[in-house]
Amino acid sequence: MSLFRKKKRNVKKPQLLTPSKALEKKGDTPTSISLMVKIKEVKELLGNNEDLQIKEFKIFGQYPAASVCLSSLINQDVLNQDILKPLMYVPEHLKGKEKPLNELVHLIVTETVYHSQAKVAEGKEQLIELMLRGESVIFIDGIKDSIHIDTRKIEKRSIAQPETEQVILGPREGFIESISTNIALLRYRLPTPDFQVKTMKIGRLTKSTVAICYLKGIANETVVKEVEKRLSEINIDAILDVGYLEQFIEDNPFSPFPQTQSTERPDKTVANLIEGRVAILVDGSPFSLLVPVVFNQFYQTTEDYSSRFLMGSFVRLARILALVFSLVFPSLYVSLISFNPELLPTEFAVAVAGGRAGVPYPAVIEVLIIEVSMEILREATVRLPKQVGGALSIVGVLVIGQAAVEAGLSSPITVVVIALTTIGSFATPTYTAAFALRMLRFPIMILAGIFGLYGVMVGVIFIFNHMLSLKSFGVPYMAPVSPEDSQGMKDVVIRSPLWWMPKRPEFLRPSNQNRLGLNDNKVLEHNKVGNDQREDAANGGSKGDHNYSSDNDLN
Amino acid sequence: MWQNQRELKVAISLLFLIPLLSGCWDSQEIEQRANVLALGVDKASEEERKKEDEISHLGKRIPIPDEEMIKVTAQIAVPGRIPLGPQQPGGSEKPVLVVEVVGHTLEDAMLNLQQEVADEIFLGHLRIIVLSEEIARHGTARFNDFLRRNPEIRRTAALVVSKESAAKYMNLDPELERIPSLYLADMVDNLSAIGKFPPSFIGLFWTIYSSKGQDPYLPYLTVIEKTTIQLNGLAYFHGDKMVGKTNPLEIGIFMAVRGVGRGGYGAFIQVPGKDESVLVRAVSRKTRTKVTLRNGKPHVSVKIQYESEIDEKESASIELSDSAILKKIETESSKSTKKAIEKLIAKTQKSKSDIFGFGEHFRAKLPHYWNRNVKTKEKWDEIYPEITFDVTVDSHIHRVGMKSK
Amino acid sequence: MGDPKEITTIQATTILISTIIGVGVLPLPLFAVRAGETSAPFVTLTGIFLAALGLFILAYLGMRHPQKTIITYSQDIIGKWLGRIFSIFVICFFLVLTSLAAREFGAVVVTGVLRETPLEVTVIVMLLLASISCRNNINVFSYIHNFYVPMILAPVLIVVAFSLKNANPLYLRPVFLGNDLRGMAAGMLTVSALFQGSFIITMIIPSMKSPNKALKASFWGILISGGLYLLIVIATVAIFGPEEIKQIFWPTLELARTTAVPGNILQRLDIIFLAVWVLAVFTTLFSSYYFTIHSLKELFQLKDHKMLSYFIMPFVFFLAMLPQNILHMYEIIQYIGRAGLLITIMYPAFLLIIDFLRSWRRKKNVAKPT
């Protein structure tokens, strides 16, 4: 009988009592007055940890106290020199004075300890959490309050050139994992009181600090509020990287196109903040997340703006071409070869037929096979350690290209086409957007294999329609091309000179529209050299003196 | 509605995707197509007619008489024998395949052709169609219908008339080019670029054939010494039947009347007063055609302005040292050109072939006259021999080359 | 509706342009030449004027009721039931228009490009594309049109520009051939039937930022699309001559075929032209499909149109498959096109007149008591 009937097993698994669960259950209880009880409670929750450091001592030689901290997180020197030492020795100005118990905390915090971050707290859960963040807690026998002092010191790597976004012209600083350094990198570029940083803690286990940065008066208030709302709705165990946040706050997670942009560069972040976007930083991740985004950001780099406008425009045009190539080139090849060879010049068409003569399967399959092998190769080279990687990638490409052709597995033109496509996809600066196009290449190839050029058009229309219907935090994805915006258009295909773009693009609905000052920019007037300039000076001097200079400001 | 809307959507989308599994209907690999590069059409001889198999009809019950059967020769490119890169020396195999079939009409012949060729025939790269003179004189309208209906055929393909049988052209092996028919096609295409022939491609042939006031013309080729092809003149048509051909120099004159800007023909002009000649080559032309009615009868005035250069003088006894002698040469050249033009127009009038397009001018500029008296193409062909014309030629010799004498 | 009113004047213009330029661009010269021979450009011009007149009536009517579409304000003007009946006519007409456009599209593709692919597949793919895109709101609708317009206009202009090299101005004369005035009038109607898509302006006006600029938008829309059509007719007539055009189904396509990019890099430009034309057809189909669904939604006061867009598709497909062959299809198109003019021009004119009468009467009634 029991073979045929499935018994429902309702056995409940016993729940493990983890310390965090214990903390969550109780709510914030105040600590008791007795030192022994306090120490016992701490040992109950954290006692198994090797790095729990409890040092009992006497304050001013009189009052029993203990310092509790997690030694792996703290700066021992600070604990010893600036906290324990002054507490154990009576300071000069207090010698001989009365130090009653009820005033002790105040005395310690304001007159004794050499630390700017000394604060008072009394909730047990709060203190434990602070300890877990690297603060040292001083328990005093007989007093409810405890003092906690920030003595955090964690090894972090130095600021280096960002690996994913390398430029030739432009700053070489990149974000690191520590959020306070990152905010510092932003703040020194924006020494204005409008730059606001709001923090929240997200993630049940990681309790990561998440910072929302924006420029008040330029960023749109609704967007900022929306960002806060979406972030506050996240309920998850761990936020290990900005990417986790991105997946929760995106408008349309099923779309292949990213609706946020992540960057490792502080100068790019600051530039976007100034346009009116909001930046989100997470402790532990060297990337900052920018919202809202539009599609044409994905082929722009900071280098475009640091260089002169002709150079920037030209390079940008090349990038756009590479982007289009990486999407449709293999499909165009397939449709020309299999469906419409009459488009090719006759001699070339006949010769291509010759190249394909030995290949045993249709052009679609051939292209798909080589594309898939290219994708695998690309993924493999990312994972290889540096020493092996360089040589292997060259060998791999040569082998696949040359040998495959000679073995009759593909025609030489296919290899050229796929190689150009792959190179083109590298030219898109944003990794996530390039990936979207890489992925979308495959459905379009299949459509091209079924319908030819018509299939390519249908696929492209489909993709464009999808992009046109996406919104990122209320901003249409294809602005400023689709809801047209004359100011924004100046930056889409070519990069107009900076003095031609006096207003911010409208799609972000910034509160403050003016980029350049109201007086005419005197940039082009600098072209007058020599006599003309002297003449100008005689007539009262140049009118624009917007940047004040002073002698003793090196900061 | 259904309990789970998502399931419904998935089911519907799967249903839609099923027809796609049946395959890519139109996909045909480029190496699996038989690219027909050139076609030659001849009249089928007696024994050839007997060779026809029953492919598009059973028995002999179609109304087209056997005597009008055509022989079609096709030159098909063989993939694999034509390499992508530079040609390896010592390629002994011919890169093209030549196939001959007979049929009652062009489409009939194509169907017969398909029976003999392994891959599916593809006409998208058809660059040139050669008609033998016999067939052209018999009438070309029967081919136009097939060529127009088929969407694969380009309007920029070339159509030419040949003196010999068209099959000979398909079997040619010129040394200048890997693929023989491409040499032929390129040559014909370049004719108008060099200035040896007015622009002509099959689309233009059809347009002119359809228009009411003009008769079509085609290049006339001949083979000299086994492998060399020569442009031997212009074949002019009455309706769709070829009625005559001009000689090569007359092509230049024809271009003058039609107003084709680019010159290319040179002629020997006798220097007045001497027994010597110089070679004067036309560089560019400008033409103005005016049509009027004189006493109710159509009259055409053509005014042509030539810009020429002297390329060569025959003997050292002529001195091209002053402008007076150039003026003399100019007047002499104008005179002889005018004569030649009048001769040509008369020649075409005899054959009732208005290749110059005078009828179009009448239709466009004198619509009342046209609507009352002419209206149709046949009527114009009757009136054409009766029209009067006068020609004025004005040559300017602008250049004499680098030699000062 | 609840959607923010964000359609700018430029967007309205581009919507009109891309809706009008559609399937009709291919057989247009054939219709014009059948009617007027060398005076085909003249016939086209008169057709454009008639269409412009119709559009202005619609725009003006819409500006008088800037918050409502024709479905709802027709109920205001001529009464609830009468308005509903006429609206049903309008909706049915656009349903048929969508299916005919899809069928014509399929016919061109199957004849000219993909000869082995079954007609049903081409039609279904296009209808599917349109119905999936119709699930969005009207702002995305205008973004889509706005985006595609330059891609549609530019290649057509380039092809026309390159082709003029072969033009023969004799074919364009005489400009006005007064032979067959009745035929020319019929041709004028056929040409203006090609502009019927502009009816959607009634749907756009309620969502425009500044509805009083609707007239300006329609003016520019007709100018650009009409100008393009005129240019195409002139170019084809000049290059092929009226007699040759009478033998070709799709003269515009032949125009693209004859044109070669200088240097002979690409030889058969008609394939590229067809690819761009797919875009133009898609925008037209999208517009008429969206209009049908949107109007249905308004007529029956449904909440949203997403499910409706899938629901209608089988009907459209069925109607598209009805004509037996291509000649039959063109007969139906001509017939329905001309009948449709009644709906798109006479009906709005009728509404406008009654609207004027009512407001005049209302003013009189207001003036009386004083």
Task: Identify the residue ranges that each predicted region occupies.
Chain A
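Generic detector of multi-pass transmembrane helix bundles and their immediately adjacent loops
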Residues: L332-S335, P345-A351, G355-G530, D536
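Membrane-embedded alpha-helical signal segments
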Residues: M1-V328, L343-T346, H466-N555
